[in-house]
Amino acid sequence: MLPRGSRVRTRQEHALVGRSGRRVRAGSIVVHSVQTDVDGPPRAGFVVGRRVGNAVVRNRVRRRLREQTRSRLSSLPPGTAVLIRALPDAAGSSSADLGRSLDSAFRTVRSPRPQRSARSG
């Protein structure tokens, strides 16, 4: 389990990250990220819906994601909150596949967001 200070725990925090965060799809997961407070540690939350499978499968996917995230969370900037959502394909993914997906998503989260050019109308 992640330490208490490294978890996105409340419904309001989940909603904040899910709605206003940057969204990155990588393999069988989607990672929502938002920069919250600068001083706090990076935090993670997990969403594994019923479409992934029955309760046993969902809990297995959640445990795998949590374990893969634990070692990678420190690579994110301080104050970053991420919400990791498993897609139905995650049920058949190995821990190594989930780890590679997390690496790819976290690389994108760490990179600066490209500037949008102003549209002329």
From Swiss-Prot:
It is an enzyme of class 3 (hydrolase). It catalyses: Endonucleolytic cleavage of RNA, removing 5'-extranucleotides from tRNA precursor. The keyword tRNA-binding does not apply. Residues 1-20, 91-121 are annotated as: Disordered. Coiled coil: none annotated. GO terms for cellular component: ribonuclease P complex. NCBIfam families: rnpA. This is Ribonuclease P protein component. The lineage of its organism: Bacteria, Bacillati, Actinomycetota, Actinomycetes, Frankiales. The gene is rnpA.
